[in-house]
Each structure stands twice: as structure tokens, then as C-alpha cells.
Amino acid sequence: REGHAFDTALYPLPPWEPLKGFTLDRALVYAFMRQESAFKPNAKSVDGARGLMQLMPRTASFIGRDRGLRGHKRNQLFSPEFNVALGQKYLRHLMETDGVDRNLVKIAAAYNGGPGNLRKWMRKIKDKNDPLLFIESLPSLETRTFIRRVLGNFWIYRDRLGQPTPSLDAIAAGQWPAYTGLDANIKKAEILIKNVENR
């Protein structure tokens, strides 16, 4: 019970919900949110990243298709619901990028280091079969640390939400960890999408 109370304090279930609801599992969104801003809606980095998911105005503008987010609307990124909505949309975008394919290590690497850097690193790293070796081969210490922390956050949130951790089992077995939706509404939506794609 003591450990549970400790997890509850360090890994809270935040009160914010993205505009139009979650389209990715809460465990994944919370994992990034915890690492990026420690759940501080007004967080701002020295580079100018803003809000709970620490979105750069340029990235937010691209994902939100609103050029104003680069300029006069950039403070909207401090709105929790708006920021988390764009953040999960960006995670989905990275997930569906060529070469990433729902791979949790690569999603985290692209989120932190940028998709362009991830592509460059993937070209340079020779051994792409071992996920742990891949992480340790990344030239950016910040990105290596970010990946490890986000994955740890993700698995703890899975546990907090009473969900299994197939991606932890995968990486422990030397396989790439993939994102699979486990929240009831996400799982249902993904089944519907697969059914449509298979028609």
C-alpha cells in the first residue's frame, strides 16, 4: 500500500482532457506530459516550447493547421485542453510516420529529437534489431534519457490504470515495443479502423 501511495503522488492522474476527448491511451499521453512539463500547464522552455506537452509554436502550427499559433495565438498553448489535444495529435502523426510504425522507442525519439534527426540516426545506426542497443547508440544524451523516462512513465501508468504492459514484455525479450490502444474507447475505435481498412 505504501508503494501505491508513492506512485499515486509521483504519477497522478491529471484532471485535464483534450478537446474532443482522448484519441490515444491516457497512459501514453500522461507519460509524455509527465516528462515534458511535470503537469505544469504554464511550463515554458528556454527554446519556447509551451504547455503540458511542451509544444513548439512551429510544431503546433503545423499539427493544428493554424499559422497564428506561431505568433499571436501562441499563448493558447498554455490552455491544458488545447495543448493536450494538439500533443496527442502530434503523437499520432509521429506514430504514423514512415519507419516509426507505432514503435514506442522511435515515437519518443522523434518527439524529443525531431523526426528529421530520427531519420538521420536510423540511417547511421547499423544494428536496428536490438531496441536497447538502438537507444544506447543514439548520439543525443538528452534523447536517450527522454526515451528511457517516457517508457518508464508509460509502464507505470499502464499499471496505475490496471492495464497489462505488452510493450514492457516485448523490450524485455529484445523485441521492439509497439503501441497498442488498451483504453476501452481507443481499443474499440482501432478495431473499427482495422475493419474498414480490411474491406
Q: Where do the model's predicted regions map?
A:
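Catalytic glycan-binding domains that act on GlcNAc-containing polysaccharides
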Residues: 1-199
